[in-house]
């Protein structure tokens, strides 16, 4: 697919320029309302801060977020040839087929498919750069510029132009979902080997040793984990780039770039972005480096089991909602967080104040 690099660069600049911080006045009104609701102060724990943050995203002290969409971007990685995963690259196209499969329960036979059906989210699937001939399917968005990234151990995974193009493709898919009614955007991914680029991105952006942020991914043993750390270390030694877009191009992946575009588009339109795990976290680090206001729109679902995720969340200054030991990806954790965020918004919107309910003791601890 041909790229108009000048137009793409201009479109990205425009997208970044549209991001504004959360509505501080709406958050102040939400905090004031929280203090008047029929409950002891702080009794709803972290739900209270989540509700205030949602007020800032949606610009009202009574947020009413509706639809949710999981946007699963799939891509292959040249670095998989280094043996950094417990699974072969052929799993990526097979899982794309699984996302699109017709099953007795409905569309999709993957974990994210089942969870999305159960918890009320639409699933969108994007070919961001799968190394296979994928069959035609009406539910598949085709955005691939090439079949998999280059091997980041030896060369840049993507060109800067490819990176920007995939970011814009992700933004376009998010726009589609939002136009269809999604107020929660949940980026998800599928790509064998993608915790390796995520580790490289995290190590460079946080300035930490690769061993501290490189985990087992699909479940590699100790020997292969040590090799994976070496691969990340050698990749980082290739170049000293620090510009966020250059870092993403050097060490990232097509699906990571696409997820970043989804996040930026959602924030630009003042929607909530639910972060799943480590790979999504690496995209978020790049995004906040590019546009600090993005942070206000990010809601980490849970701290995943992958080493390095806690460091990402600490750098972002964001608290996860749960810790279930998840490390699957696909957006699964993000979908599981939906009821918590919907519930948090409902407390602001639907609870009565002490005065409204004629309950004595307003403001008491």
From Swiss-Prot:
Catalytic machinery residues: 330 (proton acceptor)
TM ranges are none
User: What pathway is this protein said to act in by its record?
Assistant: Nucleoside biosynthesis; alpha-ribazole biosynthesis; alpha-ribazole from 5,6-dimethylbenzimidazole: step 1/2
- UniProt cross-references to InterPro entries, sorted A to Z: Nict_dMeBzImd_PRibTrfase, Nict_dMeBzImd_PRibTrfase_bact, Nict_dMeBzImd_PRibTrfase_N, Nict_dMeBzImd_PRibTrfase_sf
Q: Name one GO molecular function term.
A: nicotinate-nucleotide-dimethylbenzimidazole phosphoribosyltransferase activity
Name a biological process GO annotation. Answer: cobalamin biosynthetic process
Spell out the Pfam families in the cross-references. Answer: DBI_PRT
Instruction: Return the EC number.
Output: 2.4.2.21
Q: Which HAMAP family match?
A: CobT
List the protein's name: Nicotinate-nucleotide--dimethylbenzimidazole phosphoribosyltransferase
Q: Which organism is it from?
A: Deinococcus radiodurans (strain ATCC 13939 / DSM 20539 / JCM 16871 / CCUG 27074 / LMG 4051 / NBRC 15346 / NCIMB 9279 / VKM B-1422 / R1)
